[in-house]
Amino acid sequence: MDNKVAKNVEVKKGSIKATFKAAVLKSKTKVDIGGSRQGCVA
């Protein structure tokens, strides 16, 4: 059970990083309100 939780946390961390990276890239090319808000939440 603990192993599963740890794996879930790792996956979540990875997806947050990916989302944040995408949001940063998006805001660099053009200001996207949705992307910026998502980036702040992450």
From Swiss-Prot:
UniProtKB keywords: Antibiotic, Antimicrobial, Bacteriocin, Thioether bond
pH relationship of activity: Sensitive to extremes of pH.
Gene Ontology biological process: defense response to bacterium; killing of cells of another organism
PTM remark: Synthesized ribosomally as a prepeptide that is post-translationally modified to the active peptide. TfxB, TfxD and TfxF are all required for this processing. The chromophore is probably a six-membered ring derived from the cyclization of Gln-38.
Thiazole-4-carboxylic acid (Gly-Cys) crosslink, residue number(s): 39-40
Keyword Membrane: no
Chain residues in the propeptide: 1-31
Keyword Transit peptide: no
Top-rank lineage group of the source organism: Bacteria
In-chain residues carrying the UniProt-annotated modification Glutamine derivative: 38
Record note on temperature dependence: Thermostable.
Function noted in UniProt: Antibiotic whose production provides the bacterium a mechanism of host root nodule competitiveness with other invading inefficient strains.
Stated name of the protein: Trifolitoxin
Organism annotation: Rhizobium leguminosarum bv. trifolii
Name of the encoding gene: tfxA
